[in-house]
Amino acid sequence: MAYESIIGRNEEIKKLERFLRSSKSEFVAIYGRRRVGKSYLVEEVYKNKITFRAIGSFIKASDEKSYKQTQLDHFYENLLDSGMADDTPRPTNWREAFRLLRRYLEGIRTKRRVIFLDELPWLAGPQSSEMIAELGYFWNSWADRQRNIVLVVCGSATSWMLDNVIRDYGGLYGRLTGTIRLQPFTLGECEAYFKSHGFHLSRYEMAVAYMAFGGIPYYLDRLDNEKTLSENIDDFFFKDERINQEFKDVYTGLYATSERYLDIVKTLGSKFYGMTRKELASAVGIELGGTFSKILDNLHESGIIREYPRYGKERVETVYQLKDFFSMFYLHFINGKGTDAGNWRTLQRTPSFYSWAGNTFEMLCIEHLPQMKEKLRIATINRNYCWKGAAPDGDISQIDLVLEWKGERTDYLCEMKFSEHEYTIDRQYEKELGAKIYAFLNSKQHTKTHSIQLVMVTTQGVKPNEHAKDVNQQITLDDLFQ
């Protein structure tokens, strides 16, 4: 079935449709970054087929008891809205709440009964064990045996969803029949979105939009096709005072100690190439240990940061790097600077813009490794890493991305450069490239039986001249849209 209102998400739609056609009960968990479109996907695919929906609310309560009762009240009101009798007693705990849900569903005579529990981490609350235990009992004792139930749980707190639902070792252990991790749009999906919403942007502008908003549907929905991209960025980031709250909202509610998470994200935002665990812990003033590891795991699972190996002269270091485009833009241009109408038009010709664009374009490329792999005709990437070593003159050389394909005994050294026009390699940069190649060939990381390919990844291609002779392959912005 075609869904004209949904861009991309083809595999996810197929899964949801299969669950609906199944001859048994299905228990599905959907997770992903806040604003990525999880609720929208379920509501569009299942439309009028949802029998009951409850949504958790992020609230600040004085104590756990009042927090739980507020969520129970909302759950009860959702039952009333769905058609449960008005004289039904209000639940005081989760066992009673799920008993009411069972009673309501038993009175529904349809082929499939779809239950959608949205923002489950908020619904369950900080002390979530009771709610999760009762959800497990509801599924194990009744819903699973009905054979016509589709139970969908959804949450933006990815690490919570993994710990309490997907990898749970209690009552939900082994009960899930399907999981969906919803990712941001790719460049190609963003292009489809823009075209379907009446935008006529160049691919260069689409890339700049991606570098500002990421592939986050909620942010793209805020753009106005009657305005230029510059005007839209001004309106979204520089004129709307709510932008500061939106940045906090990405993290508030996802984690119990959101301030700690914000400290780490802001610190990483000041170091584009990232920091080691030790460097990061020292910078934010937190001890190395289980709590710190959990925070990093949570941010990684939520798609906010990435971890990658950086090969140096003596050892391999694990580096943590901010990868959330919205957060990167906010921290570079907005945080602590206030808002000023028209700022983006001014900034686009400043060194600050080119610094941000150069760094962020590298992240855009890394986030589109499958497209790079396809262009380079690489069957298998055995390793991808950052390399740092000493050049012949003693200076430190860095190759931001090395792709290793053992099957062809080839290492692809990728240089990523952002430019509005064709990128020109001059005499000085040719010399730098030669030094990088020499240093890499003589490093411990280079397998001596491997050949190398110098790959330039640019927006508009490399301008042909006498200094570009060492470039073996090129990847352009058009290739990343595939």
Q: How would you describe each model-predicted region?
A:
Residues 1-347, 454:
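Phosphate-binding site recognition
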